[in-house]
Amino acid sequence: MTHDVLLAGAGLANGLIALALRAARPDLRVLLLDHAAGPSDGHTWSCHDPDLSPDWLARLKPLRRANWPDQEVRFPRHARRLATGYGSLDGAALADAVVRSGAEIRWDSDIALLDAQGATLSCGTRIEAGAVLDGRGAQPSRHLTVGFQKFVGVEIETDRPHGVPRPMIMDATVTQQDGYRFIYLLPFSPTRILIEDTRYSDGGDLDDDALAAASHDYARQQGWTGAEVRRERGILPIALAHDAAGFWADHAAGPVPVGLRAGFFHPVTGYSLPYAAQVADVVAGLSGPPGTDALRGAIRDYAIDRARRDRFLRLLNRMLFRGCAPDRRYTLLQRFYRMPHGLIERFYAGRLSVADQLRIVTGKPPIPLGTAIRCLPERPLLKENA
């Protein structure tokens, strides 16, 4: 059977594309292929409520594992509670919603060849489609220079209520090591909490055992005892420099990359859910029979515009990674979280105004002026990948 849209990978980006397509065009036959045996319990996708359009927030809120009305941060010289909603989605809930929408997911499907017309599985089966998108995770690109956000999280069932009422987006009062380090907390119930040791590092190597042990150490320091029920890990790109036009010139043929594979993530935070929702809207908004090249053009236009709007965010990353000593990186975030509430929300949503940008860099500089000036050019960092 020929499908209208074939999505390689059944993760976040393609899951949201499937939901959007089936909602906008219920006549389309949408197929997702993934090599895994089923949805992973090793992924938690979170975002702030204002990061999403009202339609996407309404669509995803019922699917979320948890929703919270507020959040907080903690630094050595500053702590703050923010009245901004926050929520988390897991792989099982997303996969279930995709199937209920009428799209098909085929697990245990190892793709040997993916092209603009379809996929050939390792078993020899050929699947044709009108449009083919590739959302099988991040790949290095000479057009994208990155640092890394690395984490290992342990979810524990505590013996007694842990007493954490809201997400702790960053607890940077911990010892700084391997770059900017903080603990991220998600309290899913009074006795269930995810504790994630996170590092903003120059290198992408991840010592799972060490970071898991650090997460357990944090729990003990809080007086929490209990059993580990789940673990997750991640190595996310943090964009320092990006040539979107060059990237898409390299992808002028073949399947269309989406998700992390296309560099669709918030440059500073690494959050990918809001950008995935925006791309899903682009895909679902096209009229007529779906075609790989038509989708390529629309997604490329979105990508180039998004990269242009994110230039300032990449500058902030260059200041963080190239302009600040690793053990002092936390001071930039500590200063940022003294900014107005609305500015912080717009930062996470990728909607900073020019006035917001000036507010962030005005005043006592977080790094020496000469160092900041050296961080301005983006092109030299791309040459590192040449």
Swiss-Prot record:
Belongs to the lycopene cyclase family. NAD(+) binds at residues 4-34. It catalyses: a carotenoid psi-end group = a carotenoid beta-end derivative; all-trans-lycopene = gamma-carotene; gamma-carotene = all-trans-beta-carotene. Catalyzes the double cyclization reaction which converts lycopene to beta-carotene. One of its GO terms (biological process) is carotenoid biosynthetic process. Pathway: Carotenoid biosynthesis; astaxanthin biosynthesis. It comes from the Bacteria. GO terms for molecular function: lycopene beta cyclase activity; oxidoreductase activity, acting on paired donors, with incorporation or reduction of molecular oxygen. Keywords: Carotenoid biosynthesis, FAD, Flavoprotein, Isomerase, NAD, NADP. The gene is crtY. SUPFAM superfamilies: FAD/NAD(P)-binding domain. Its cofactor is FAD. The lineage of its organism: Bacteria, Pseudomonadati, Pseudomonadota, Alphaproteobacteria, Rhodobacterales. Its EC number is 5.5.1.19. This is Lycopene beta-cyclase.
